[in-house]
Amino acid sequence: MTTTVAVVGATGRMGQLISQIVEASTEFELVASLDSKDELSDMLGADIAVDVTLPAVSQGVVEYAVAHGMNVLVGTSGWTGERITELERRITGKLAVGVVIIPNFSVGSVLATSFAQMAARFYDSIEIVEAHGASKIDSPSGTAVRTAELMSQARGARGPVQAPHTDQRARGQQVASIPVHSLRMQGVVAKQDVVFGGNGEVLTISHDTLAPSAYEAGILLALRATRTARGVVVGLDRLIDLDGSRERAAQAAAGDAPSGPVDDGGPSGQAATVTSA
């Protein structure tokens, strides 16, 4: 049985891409394409709504869909922690609906953010540089904001990043104590560098989106999750098996033991680590 989809913001770059993916899929059917001239009521009757509008419009779209019992996939930037918390208060445990908020549909970008989250515990000097096309209105990007927030959470007892000279405008906008620098220019799809400075070293975790096709796998994954979502789910990382725990659980349930390392008669991993250059 196919799931019917209404795309709000269908004439934008992401709206067009999602519409194409839905139309090419056998799992989903595009039944409504809305732009700024259409009434939100035109989305009613679809199984799920996809919001890819503008930050100033997105909240109203989501509230309307939720009020009419529709699950929503949000691909619009600008959903701050406060706005998400308010949405959670409104619907969690009260309405049988789900809202899936995805700051970035790229699996590679999600992995880069996960790596940055791991590294944040080991460095006290951290900054983010993100770049998007000149037409992107909001800054910092939703991906940069989420990356900064996740790194701040991961730091735990290390506390906030103590970035120097943040009173100067050229030092970027602080998000969860981490300076974020935004570039908006022609020729760029999406790029983010998370830069860590340590004693005598610099670590850069970089992700560069070269074409919109990078979002396709994440969009399909998010659409599938939106069908059955309840409450508020934020981030593609919540939908993919980052640590392999779901795969291991599935193997255990099926009675399939995961294969262990092959003993080739050589030195153990510990010995090899000690003796290798």
Curated annotation (Swiss-Prot):
GO biological process, any: lysine biosynthetic process via diaminopimelate
Amino-acid biosynthesis among keywords: yes
Segments of this protein annotated with the region Disordered: 154-173, 247-277
InterPro entries reported in the protein's UniProt record: DapB_C, DapB_N, DapB_N_CS, DHDPR_bac, NAD(P)-bd_dom_sf
Pfam families documented for this protein: DapB_C, DapB_N
Compositionally biased intervals (Low complexity): 250-265
CDD domains, per the entry: DHDPR_N (cd02274)
GO cellular component, one term: cytosol
Binding site for NADP(+): K37
EC number(s) recorded for this UniProt protein: 1.17.1.8
Entry keywords, A to Z: Amino-acid biosynthesis, Cytoplasm, Diaminopimelate biosynthesis, Lysine biosynthesis, NAD, NADP, Oxidoreductase
Function per UniProt: Catalyzes the conversion of 4-hydroxy-tetrahydrodipicolinate (HTPA) to tetrahydrodipicolinate.
Similarity comment: family membership: Belongs to the DapB family.
Protein name: 4-hydroxy-tetrahydrodipicolinate reductase
Phylogenetic classification of the source organism: Bacteria, Bacillati, Actinomycetota, Actinomycetes, Micrococcales
